[in-house]
Amino acid sequence: MAAAVAVFVFGLCVYGYAIQLPFRIDDFVHFRLLSIHTLANVWLGEAGLAYYRPLPFTIWKVINVLTGGFPPVVIHAINVICHALNGALVLALIYLHQSRTAKGLIVGSVAAVLFLLFPFSYQAVPWAGALTHPLVTLLMLASIVTAVRAQDGASRALRVISLAGTVLAPFAHETGVLVALGLTLFLVTSGRAKNLRELVARTWPYWLISLLAAGSMLAVRLHAGSPVAPAEMESRLQNGVYFVQGLAYPAAPIATRLLGLAPGLNDLGAVLLASVPVLALLAFVCVRLGQGRLVLFGLGWFLFMVTPAWLLLAFSYVVDGPRLMYEASLGAALFWSIPVAILVDRWASLTTVVKRLAAAIPAAVVVIGAVVGSAGFLAERADMYEQTRLASVGMLQAAVQPAEDKRNILSVNFPGWIAPKTATYALGHEGVSFIPEYSSPSDLVWAMTGVDSPMYNAVVTELQSHWRFNYLNYGSRWTAPDLQPQLRIARQVLFTSYRGQNLATYSAGRLEAENMARDDAVAASYDDRLAVRSGDWRIVPEGLLVTLHWQSWLTLTQEVRTFVHMRDAATGEMAAQEDGLPLMGLSNPLWWKPGDQWADTRLLVLPQTVRPGKYALWVGVYPADGSARLPALDAARHRLPGDEVMVGIVTIP
């Protein structure tokens, strides 16, 4: 019991960060549909959903009814809890498989840890919409564990629970029809079924339910007009290699190095070359050392669970769906835990420290290598998921602010997809999808807050920055000059910055007013054409966010750039600066009209050399060709030294 609790807590720790994440990809579509459909629609297949998986949608609909929305923390917590429970059930299953021995406890604990850290589960747990995979796995494992306990003479109530789980599993995901196959594999490889007759007696109710469920699923798909046909042979071959990579996950990264060493080798060949010999060698050694039943259980489970996707899905879908290996990951985790089983069996017969050390090293290398590799891979994905959260914060804050103005928000360079610079595995797309083409950040705002916020999304490539991850932005491609009319009609302009270590979405400013009378009570005017009225600022994790309030007096006759310099208030030494066009590079004063008043926000990234203290903020304007600054006058029409004005003193703590 203590080991199961420890495994459960470990599972919560691995993916606990996910409860803070925003929704993504299909979540927006699913929740929109659920908000207008009833539970009856869901169970009758009339909710417009792509797949008939009513159980997870029922959970979300009940939450929606009870809370009036789709609270992200609650919905993400369900995925995380299911995953952690699955880890505990993996331990229980292997413990029972090994007749409740110390060996079963040790091997089960190791397998549970590897299961919880399986790298290709990075999509299934943090993505709310992938609940189908942790949920069906929970129902399948719970059904098998309770079935075995009931057959061992425990409470008859466990038999009822087991059969109920078997009935419900297919309604979570199509893989749920494999409960009977999983139970049969368990009984055969554990030696609990002595002959075929006993095996049939123990499993026939589960086979009956599974076959009825499979027939029902087929009928529903045919009724809905969904295709039910095997994938093309090429896809099946590619799918097979992709799943081999998943099974061999601790060794499979070698394939990326092989690609660099052998230019004529393609990714499929590299995966096979890196994976198959390792899998064959490990299986051979484990069988020769008396672990044939565990090898059969692990490999058999993995094979059975990936078979539906291998046969039916196109490779283009599979290669984007590492979550498809979630149910099968138990088999991979067990397979790579078998060296520990060998060590446990041989431990008592090893009479010297040297012999025990020699036996422990291979097992430790395999398990620790798998743990370290997986943990590093998952940590990088957690970082990418966190970036989507950070990018969302500013957008959500801006979108939910009460505003009588119903004009669109203009969002520029918001992330739609983030991926590592270097791939770990030769096959697959290892990035984190966020906003798909068929959805929009407006849907994100609605799903997270319940607020419908009209939004226009643009990608301005000349303002994209090199960053530590690869990324794609969501929206239509525009140049900054072409975007000027959109800036004038937006109630707020949001800009996602990639300049720092972390993403941040800021309010870049907006057109505050038009056709305003000339205001001579300004901080400074420049060439009698442009005036800065005031400035304010706030410290943010990425630096100093400065907002300048401008008024256009006359149309400019040349391209200009504006600057904000932060200098030591005592010495005048430059500490940080930001030169460029207003609104984080989006708005060109050349197109401002007389009487326009603009709020212009820009980010000053503070170097690590900036010490705590007081700093003056200076503002000026100069021609884009770099020639002398425009003459700056104060409100009394006196020329300002250096043609710049101090708009305030900021204290850096």
Tell me what each language-model feature is:
Residues 396-653:
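C-terminal luminal/periplasmic domains and tails of membrane-associated envelope-modifying transferases
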Residues 1-451, 486, 490, 494, ...:
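Polytopic membrane enzymes that build or remodel cell-surface glycoconjugates and lipids
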